[in-house]
Amino acid sequence: AVLSEEGIPAYSVSREGYFETYEVSVLLDYLKILDNARQDLPLAAVLTSPFGNLTPAEMAEIRTAYPNLPFYEAVRAYAEEGGDSGNEGMAAGRAFTGESGRESDSGRDRALWRKLERFFDQMAHFRAKVPYTPVHELLTEIIETTGFGLSVAAMPAGAQRAANVDMLVEKASAFEGTSYKGLFNFVRYIGQLRKYDVDYGEAGVMDEQSDTVRIMSIHKSKGLEFPIVFAAGMG
């Protein structure tokens, strides 16, 4: 991070932590909720990602409005309340039964409703394709049509993040070449890899000849020759 801040290109290949990178974990969480939306942690992660763009305050607003419902049901109820806001009879009935702790549909509420409407419309679109679309094709469409790929590429270390996303698509394509196919099986397969600490390591974005600072362990550097070497943490 320090080298990047100073404008010095640096490169370090990680042999672990691929599934824990932000961009990969969010994409996997999105696949999880396409398979089964009633998973609170993946749903919360996706809603606060570029897919949903919800703020912590908006997440708290949903939970406050429906404190006794499971989170997925609370989000759906909040979204449906926004869709029904023009129906006076339903709004009055909701106020009478006390289903929601909300008292008005302020501008902030309407902005949140629009976010949720867009989010669930996208989910419905992709979920309809799950039965007949190979996972790697589904992933590619999700990345491209939602703007997720552009979002992660614009983040710090964007080239590395984009390479990690591309690598996930490649892994999904390779998986489709096995006897196991479909979203459910792919999500389960990744879950098993994570359970047994099987990690791919982050995707490589530079070749051996790149004009850059290469960060590596002493063990990994054996047999290599560099004109300048900094050995950090020696005492």
Predicted regions mapped to residue ranges:
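Conserved motor-region signature of P-loop NTPase helicases/translocases
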Residues: 1-65, 73-76, 90-92, 96-99, ...
